[in-house]
């Protein structure tokens, strides 16, 4: 990235303000679809991660601006009430689709029909025109999103969050390739969506180059960070609260423990650091739970730690709420983000907002989230020796770490959830003003006087149970 800002890098990618005034009708109500994971779930466990944070943070702020948000997600427990008010103006609707437990994310395509029917039934209880638009998150939700678009006669905005073709091009050892069915599903959503949200200009280029998306319909809207939660603090006090000694060299990895996130890279790197610098006290704090392939025998991180004999230097901790995670960031000398792919990398921004430098892989959105040499460093590849070098360069050079800490705070200050919501609202208005209705694709015959789509005996009508 150099010395210029991430905002400057992507400035040309933002769509201009809509210039709306009193005559511009507001967005009243949004249907957000997050099939496979709920914004109420604890990030760092199961399939919950940055997407959960994103949906929760933007929904709160949309509601604060007068936009009602209803989030549809799959129920994962019989104890969950059908509707939960997250905050005033934000409802989470739990849709029963398949068994409550025992389904991995990879099993969920088989529940798309059931989930879509549940969403349609929930909407059918409302007066026509209840939602102004649909925002789907991840490809599974996009499949339901474009059904809702056609059935309700509203525009669809879609956020991919991750892309199968990008993941398959940068697979970690032990990870499974994304199936062709997902790729086809993503291609379908790209065609159907009225607007696509990309976290960075690089993601926009991937959507265009790999999926044939229309660049004119892609809006670059970076995620943000809650600086009221993630802010600098007393490192000594944070360490005391966590039972960490003042003289320890502390490296933090936060996130789901799965091959894609590369936790094994930092485990091996810290093992090398302990060998290189035996007089130093090293501690790697790993915050999060196993997910996906990371739960399988032979791929579990605990097994690698035992194989290396590194139990004395590794501190496993469960996923924690944001306020507690901020304390862990403050206690660290550096936060490591060795992912094989990230569309953005919220952990990197949260850590920097807490005043902690970040050493991250030079991939995807991390090259925007981290300013190389200013707020941390970017590492090419995943060789543990190279990562050990990069981590040592920060942890063992106190003046350099202090400079990077200042740069980290400045870097994070460029990203805010309010700015994210500004971008989303511009995109929503652009989708509403330019929404397309394809007369030949799904048997849609006409749009009636109140703007609802009438499907003359189409499969959509039957799936929707209307």
Swiss-Prot record:
Q: Where does Mg(2+) bind?
A: 329-330, 332, 356
Q: Which CDD domains match?
A: GT4_sucrose_synthase
Which GO MF terms are attached to this record?
Answer: acetylglucosaminyltransferase activity; D-inositol-3-phosphate glycosyltransferase activity; magnesium ion binding
Which residues span the membrane?
none
Could you tell me which SUPFAM superfamilies the record lists for this protein? UDP-Glycosyltransferase/glycogen phosphorylase
Spell out the HAMAP family in the cross-references.
MshA
Name of the molecule in the record: D-inositol 3-phosphate glycosyltransferase
